[in-house]
Amino acid sequence: GDGLPDGEVRDVYRELDPGSAVTLALRARGRVLGAMSVYRARGRQLMDIWDQETLSEVADRVALALDSAALQEQERRMAEDLQRSLLTAPPEPDHAEIAVRYVPAVRAAQVGGDWYDAFLQPDGATVVAIGDVVGHDTVAAAAMGQLRSLLRGIAYSTSGGPAHVLGDLDRAIEGLQVHALATAAVARFEQTSEERGRGETRLRWSSAGHPPLMVLAPDGGVQVLATERADLMLGVHPTAARKEQVLPLPWGSTVLLYTDGLVEGPGLPLDDGVARLAGLLGELGDRPLAELCDQLVARMRPGGSEDDVALVAVRLHPEDRPRPPEAGPTIVPRVLPPVG
């Protein structure tokens, strides 16, 4: 016991007072990961060669298990780093305040495919997207990064509406052989001069099998934007027609996009979760936007979620007056001059 460190280990060793011991190195892939010591009480037969061979096999298995666990943790962290690097802060245009939240699953070993994005198209419209790739591993995280980048590139380069963007994305998934299934919703906030004069912003949205958007009106009423027929997920049928819905919204409205981890789980069917979220949105709707997002997550998932949760909230403001103090400053990309 002289080689043991001071503290609890040495105290336990003295209490057990073993008569013999064998210490074996834990090796895996040419690296020493640690050591395993086995003790036998005084008065018992000393360990023989057979005991040592058995213990050597046990040590090999322990080392492999430790090495596998370390590799899985490294893989999980890499996927999580990739995921978080893509979930960037949103822009803050004059006409809208945008708040985003991402909460990983409570089971640390899982990395999901939830993602969100918000950006301005060249014509000044604001696009908000959210999605969920099927799976909870590095493959799902990598596919999430591909789909998010593809959607952003398509929406920015074409200035297309949500249905057009989702249709092009579905065809890109097929043509580029991105092996993924995913749900997604895309919302575009746009204004004409006439709409601006009426104090309205037009919401144009399309869904690919994603949970329905919600709208909180300035008077506190909540509208769940469910479609009559569920749209196909991405990656199922690349030539499927995508539907687009349009809704004029008065300034002061709040639009909520979220993934199913917020509204579905053990003991909480999806429809019940959507109804509960709509009730909470109406109850908490007068809160500042960042606080609203935090409260919705805390109230819907007080003990955490077994699935990732992504949430995007957009609150519309007039363009002809300063942004409210709680909305923070305007932050938008620099406008580049046209090429040529």
Per-region residue spans from a language model:
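Signal-transducing coupling segments at domain and membrane junctions
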Residues: 1-19, 172, 237
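Short hydrophobic beta-strand micro-motif common in sensory/regulatory domains
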Residues: 17-27
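Short hydrophobic/aromatic beta-strand element in the GNAT-like acyltransferase core
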Residues: 23, 35, 115
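Signal-transmission/dimerization alpha-helices at domain junctions
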Residues: 29-36, 41, 45, 52-75, ...
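… and, occasionally, acidic/histidine-rich disordered N-termini of signaling adaptors
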Residues: 73-256, 295, 306-340
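Cytochrome P450 core scaffold surrounding the K-helix E-X-X-R motif
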Residues: 215-218, 266-270
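Low-complexity, intrinsically disordered Gly/Pro/Thr-rich segments
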Residues: 293-302
